[in-house]
């Protein structure tokens, strides 16, 4: 009997050890899950930081490109200035060469004059007055020549000075080209000061050159006054233009300062809002830390929090308002990517992050320039629209309609693909949410099963205790003599054995109940344990040796199983039931995988998406039909144009045919006239031969006359005159025929040339129309992109505000629910 009890006790201790190990493994699994969640959160934060770093790098590269563009423009401007100075120096060199030639000629004249004067000194008849006049006339060229040589020296010195200044400017420009793009502000200011000083030196040199040139022109060339006045007028105009540009620059700087002040105010407002958001986040975190855990917070705490706004990330499909596709068609059709990274406009977020810089001002100026170009295009179209014929306008309209229909077709296809993508995305999000619900329900069911198993085990022990107590009471009644004969020894032995078995069963049940109480004290935290018998969780999970010694000492414990222990066991059963009920409350309602959710708030969204998809398909078909109709119209217009060209060719061929017929008729009439003249000549010869009676019979016998008889009868002069007249008429007719043929050829050539010119003109107009359409579309795209970006920024701000308000409302609702709920020992997932 003792061996059986020991074996049973060993089995109970091994079962207890296995349960303790399973509890330790469950706690370790929970730690692993928590560590995995932390790892995923750190990975998300790392991805967010990488995105921010990439964005910062993109902004840095954009600023570097803008800085390079500014440097290139300034370099080109200074190179143009240097080129102008080179041209001025070349002109001055030419003038200096001309002055040198004039001085050489004057020196030659002076030498000739001196030779003449030396010859005149030998003459005795010359008086002193003529000598004085000659001396004065000699002194004037000497002074003039000395002044010219001095001016030449000054010009050469000035030329060397200008060459030195220009070499310095070129060195500055080359050094600016070779300098790196990452210059500091002090170095940039230093370069600007050097360039300004160089430009001042250059202006001073130009002024000195102009002054010397004016002096030279006034002293030596009086006819250069007009040129000097013209240059002075041009210089005055340039100075006025410079003053106007300086005033414009000052106004732009004032506007820039105002914009900087506005941006500073916006930054202060942004910093204030950020501080307020941080304060709200800290308050929420403090409220979350102080508030007790509840199963009602399970669904809200498992959702990720947006690090920028601190809101709970919810599904956008459940909060969005459905919009009909007909009302949303223009908005969807405008979604396009940016043209290029270099032409990317400056956004509002960049202005708020980096402040107002030169790139922003250049971008605004570029936008104004684009707008001015568009206005010029429309003004040109308006001013030159009357010169285009109706056929060209019709052709342009047909081509524009065809292109617009093609664009609308592509837009409708893009809308359909966008809606399909959104639908697939919503389905994927719904499936992921459904998978999360299934996982949550599986975890809850696993916990409920564990609680149910513990309850069943406790009920089995209570049943064993009740049965042992019942058998013990029955044995005591038998021992007391209730229901048995008084003198039966075998009955007494049976009663003693029954009492012994009842005591053993009672002892075994009490030991099992004590072990279960110890395990429940370790797992449930000893909320209902009695002092002296409670065991903490870390004591139950410390080591295997400790658990084995605890179980062995508990079996030999002198304390008996009291009613208080039984009540504790019943309290644990009630606690397990409460925990199981709390876990069941956390289970979510599941929908089918293959159908849409039937909730009231999501169903209208599904209907709106279905309507949007149907509308997008119908719009695509409509745009395809419009495109086909536009193409058919274009083909019909081309066929009509070919028909008109063929009709023109046919009319020209008919005119040629009429001309050829007239020519043939004229030739026929000429031939008939010649025949009539010959007949008249023959009749005149026959009437002259009627006087001879002897030849009448011969004439009657031979009706035709021979050539010899004709020569004998007609005079040679008449025949010669007729032949000359016939030859003259034939020449005239040939000349007229040649004139008609040449005129016809000229007409055909001119018509062909006009046709080619009209075709070329049509092609030029087509190209101009395509260029105008492309420019208009580009400007329209830019304007639409700007509007879209502003709308997106505004919607982002509104959504951020709404999400913050919604997050605060959710937090308030959760806190109110936690405060209103009674404080019980509830278990959260």
From Swiss-Prot:
Nucleus recorded as keyword = yes
Which PANTHER family does its entry note? COLORECTAL MUTANT CANCER PROTEIN, COLORECTAL MUTANT CANCER PROTEIN MCC PROTEIN -RELATED
Chief subcellular location? membrane
- Cite the record's Basic and acidic residues compositional bias ranges: 123-132, 689-698
Q: What is the effect of changing residue 506 to Q?
A: In colorectal cancer samples; somatic mutation; decreased binding to CCAR2; significant decrease in its ability to induce the relocalization of CCAR2 to the cytoplasm; loss of its ability to repress the beta-catenin pathway; loss of its ability to induce the SIRT1-mediated deacetylation of beta-catenin
Question: What is the name of the gene encoding this protein?
Answer: MCC
Question: Which parts of this chain are annotated as the region Disordered?
Answer: 114-139, 282-320, 672-700
Which body tissues produce this protein?
A: Expressed in a variety of tissues.
Oligomeric state and interaction partners are given as:
Interacts with SCRIB (via phosphorylated PDZ-binding motif), EZR, SNX27, NHERF1 and NHERF2. Interacts with CTNNB1; the interaction is enhanced upon Wnt stimulation. Interacts with MYH10. Interacts with CCAR2.
Give the GO terms filed under biological process for this record: establishment of protein localization; negative regulation of canonical Wnt signaling pathway; negative regulation of epithelial cell migration; negative regulation of epithelial cell proliferation; signal transduction; Wnt signaling pathway
Q: What is the lineage of its organism?
A: Eukaryota, Metazoa, Chordata, Craniata, Vertebrata
What protein am I looking at? Colorectal mutant cancer protein
Phosphoserine: residues bearing it: 828
